[in-house]
Amino acid sequence: MKVIGITGGIGSGKSLVADIMIKKHNAYLINSDTIAREQMKPGGASYKGVVDYFGEGILSGDGTIDKEKLSAIVFSDREKLLKLNSLTHPNVLKEVQKIIEEKRRSKTVPYCIIETALMIESGYDFVCDEVWYVHTPECERRKRLKQYRGYSDEQIDAIIRNQSREEDFFKRFDKVIYNDDGIWRLDEQIDKLLDKTTQISDTQ
């Protein structure tokens, strides 16, 4: 089983690439955002640490963490964002590693993919056999985020500012998928990358 990381800036199309891998290549998806959300629920691995640090002011009436309240704090203060990451990322990474080992033992899938925008910041690349960077021009990403998620320019600016720059991705990862020319082009690029992955495996 190969572990493939899929990363890129917000709105780049990581989920679309992951969906193709699942439907066409029988891959198993590990989504770091989904794990993080589960761990932030009451009783979750990150809940107590986050509430202890940020205070009960971030809670809703039912005791759950209010995502909008927390986001308003961390996206206006980089130090607090870094603190939030330090409280949550190790827990997510631990769960990711656990799932990978379970899938390796089960021998039921050829690929396990990790979808995350924070591949570099969180150290997920070190548990991957290879990492694919999904690249989409920023202007197109902004258009998608406004159209499909209803984000404002201010929200987009804050998120992009706190993610790795395109130059960092290009320096770190040499397997790039260009998502600017339709789904058929994505299919083609994924097939080529998987062919190379298979060839490398056959020679090892």
Question: Where would I find each of the regions flagged by the language model?
Answer:
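Short beta-strand-centered segment that lines the nucleotide-binding/catalytic pocket of NTP-utilizing
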Residues: 27-40
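Small-molecule kinase domains that catalyze NTP-dependent phosphoryl transfer to phosphate-bearing small molecules
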Residues: 96, 126, 147, 151-197, ...
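ATP-binding Walker
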Residues: 12
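Hydrophobic anchor at the beta1->P-loop junction of P-loop NTPases
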Residues: 6
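ATP-dependent NMP and nucleoside kinases share a basic, alpha-helical "lid"
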Residues: 97-106, 112-147
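ATP-dependent small-molecule kinase phosphotransfer cores
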Residues: 37-110
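P-loop (Walker A) phosphate-binding loop of NTP-binding proteins
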Residues: 9
